[in-house]
Amino acid sequence: MIFERKKYLDELIAGRGNGLVKIITGIRRCGKSFLLFDIWHNWLLEHGVTDNHIIEIQLDDFRNRRLRKPDALLDYIDSKVVDDGNPYYIVLDEVQLVEEFVDVILSLTHMRNVDVYVSGSNSRFLSSDVVTEFRGRGDEIRIWPLTFDEYFNGIGGDIRKAWLDYYTFGGLPQVALLETEEKKTDYLRGLYETTYLRDVIERNHLRNPEGMKELVRVLASGIGSSTNPTRIAHTFQSSQGVTIKRDTIKQYIDYLKDSFLIEEALRYDVKGRKYIGTETKYYFADIGIRAAILNYRQQEETHIMENIIYNELRSRGYNVDVGLVELGGKDENGKFVRRQLEVDFVVNRPPYRVYIQSAFHMPTPEKEQQERRPLLSINDHFRKIVIVGDDIHRKEDELGVLTIGLLDFLTDKKLLEQG
């Protein structure tokens, strides 16, 4: 079973020889090492690069422990690079294990005819500001867990069964390779407890690990719901009698974002063209991890579908906000009132903008009108889409609103770029 990761291969090809360090980031176990040591390695060989011009070092291998010293690593690479006019490709995995690794990598950029690629899964490397540390010499390539299209193309078979597995266990490549539901469940639970959660707690020297664990559960329980640190603090107080300060919760959320475990979707006033800072929504980078955190309770189809759509949009390279549309009008008593309608996703990647509603079912004309109303209240020329969980034929009405089935959307990579 092979997962091609063509999008990321294309990004590596586009950045080849650009003079920047290619920094492969993303949640742990999402396939960064496989991308570099298998997919990228094979592509280089197929395109004329000889094996002795590919220098690969897995720094978590105990046999390479001496190379974790800066001088030893630089001396080793120097011994392998011969100025024969052909470029060398230096690939370093778990690079954060090297002492002063930022300065070491910057030293490599001063060498002639070298192209440098680094990845890592430790929290030191996973920090979201790692690219900044490279002082403008880094080119970040963000890796996501498998999209549904990547997952289905890898495993094949019946698309509905593939969807049920993906919906339940997410898109981490190793999970897809496990044969039974029990193995998948055990793997995800162990990965969360011993890797993701421990990494965040140890890196940030948290004195209240139980508070962090409970916060993650609260966020997992509320995916797709607007919230803020103040509201979460009230939830702790009312449901558990536990006091955690708003600023502490905000800091904990930042730690989770830095580890790529969650992402934040900001609220955007579509007509006012400004961000509204009162509340945000949070989504998990992998829906299988979210399920494991909640012990596979709360498998609500509407929220899981929304999280998967969010991840799909982000993996395609779009910025994603939650849209608000304010309308004014008279109520039944003739009094002028203002109402706010929500657009699930305002999707941006210049020159494209798309407004998207996620609706698991639209069984009645009233429900369909409810989902379309926020989109029709936006008076601009950008595309407007309703994604439904049912298998339907896509249709575009006279007002330009496209309705499309979920699996159709997830497997059509060019849809958002069409006029």
Language-model region placement:
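A cross-kingdom feature that marks ATP-driven nucleic-acid transaction machinery
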Residues: 2, 34, 45, 49, ...
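Interdomain hinge/linker elements that couple catalytic modules in large macromolecular machines
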Residues: 2, 149-326
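Pre-Walker A adenine-sensing motif
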Residues: 2-19
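Conserved catalytic segments around the Walker B and adjacent sensor/switch elements
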Residues: 45-61
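Short glycine-rich substrate-engagement loop in P-loop NTPases that contacts/grips substrate
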Residues: 56-86
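Short regulatory helix/loop adjacent to the ATP-binding pocket of P-loop NTPases
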Residues: 124-139, 154-156
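Structural recognition of the conserved hydrophobic beta-strand(s) that form the central parallel beta-sheet
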Residues: 115-121, 142
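Hydrophobic anchor at the beta1->P-loop junction of P-loop NTPases
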Residues: 24
